[in-house]
Curated annotation (Swiss-Prot):
Its EC number is 6.1.1.22. Pfam families: tRNA-synt_2, tRNA_anti-codon. The gene is asnS. Keywords: Aminoacyl-tRNA synthetase, ATP-binding, Cytoplasm, Ligase, Nucleotide-binding, Protein biosynthesis. It comes from Borreliella afzelii (strain PKo). This is Asparagine--tRNA ligase. It is found in: Cytoplasm. Belongs to the class-II aminoacyl-tRNA synthetase family. GO terms for cellular component: cytoplasm.
Amino acid sequence: MFASIKDILENPILNSNVTINGWIRTKRSNGKIGFIEINDGSTLKGIQAVINEEENQFDEKDLKNLTTGASISLTGLLVESPAKGQNYEIKTCGFNVIGEADPKTYPLQKKRHTFEFLREIPHLRIRTNTFGAVARVRSKISYKIHEYFQKNGFFYINTPIITSNDGEGAGEMFRVSTLKFNKPNNDLGNIDFKDDFFGKEAFLSVTGQLHGEAYAMALSKIYTFGPTFRAENSNTTRHASEFWMIEPEMAFYKLNDNITLAEDLLKYLLSSILNECSQDMDFLENYIEKGLIKKLENVINSNFEVITYTKAIEILESSKKNFEIKPYWGIDLQTEHERFLTEETFKKPVVVIDYPKNFKAFYMKINKDNKTVKGMDVLVPKIGEIIGGSEREDNLQKLENRIKELNLSIEHLNWYLDLRRFGSTPHSGFGLGLERFVQYSTGISNIRDSIPFPRTPKNLYF
């Protein structure tokens, strides 16, 4: 049995024999004494192993195979290190190079590589300090999401990835089909999906919300956490075609309850990573985004400002800021507008509510003015919207009217209307995109670097 490098560094037993397994990050030598840094991914910093050829007999071939990227199993004595920047090192007694790495072709050498280059080798970029740190923080966030909801009486449910519904009504969906590409059309010139696998048109899910609402109508508080897909042709630093969503749905929750939950969740997650990922967060602060920790602490220590969409537009219109897209009532807020509100006006997170219904989803509850809906967007400095949600329409007739108004299919949504026919109740929910939250938490500027294998337009490695 061997220990992880993290365990050894956190619980050192000096002058004891230890065995570690990992990959060589760096190698240097001073005559007959060699120094290699080994990392196993359990922690940001690896551990230095000293190989003294004068004290031990090592196979010449094995010594030549000690190259950057090679995997190794090494045994030695854990001692205090006289070198600066490290507390411990291993005096090597023996080692075995498990997997060689040719230094002439291994793409990750001891230098800083650009993010653009690393995106071309997503299967290897995880071996860098930056992507290792991001991966550990992402893992911690995922764990803490489950912890938060479980502690607060929520039930975790799995919603379908293949669906016949467009949960957002936007039409930006990936079709799932087993039909041959040359299948003939029907008499109307359309593809006949009766012969398809499911006997109807099927898509990859854009949200688990609608199915989540069904379970909230019985379990009261649920959350989903899974992959979602958007066929949105957006080549930006904030959009991906495949991403993970956290979507809680709560029966008997009004909009204000929804806002309170969203704020509490964000603060819980940010506090957790600052407390439990301090080494990785310090690295990201130093090398990725100066002021990162202060930015996150500002969110944790702030009371989120809640304003209406109408008030937000008034603030934007009265400002002297020269926006690329001029704000006016009826336009969806752009990132530049959201950042102005959070960074220059309030200097803290802002929750914008009561959006015009004309650009919001069909399921949002319409306000008494019949012009706005009980929607909410949580905006944070530097990135803008990070959470989107609403109180859901619980009135059957109003929901039917809204579906017809938007020319959506009553037939496809009849099951969803059943939730209003039988024991309807006020209920709310929201969505938090994991990748965008990882972006914000780590300072990574491009969403392609916050997910292991990004899927974006014209980009599908592996």
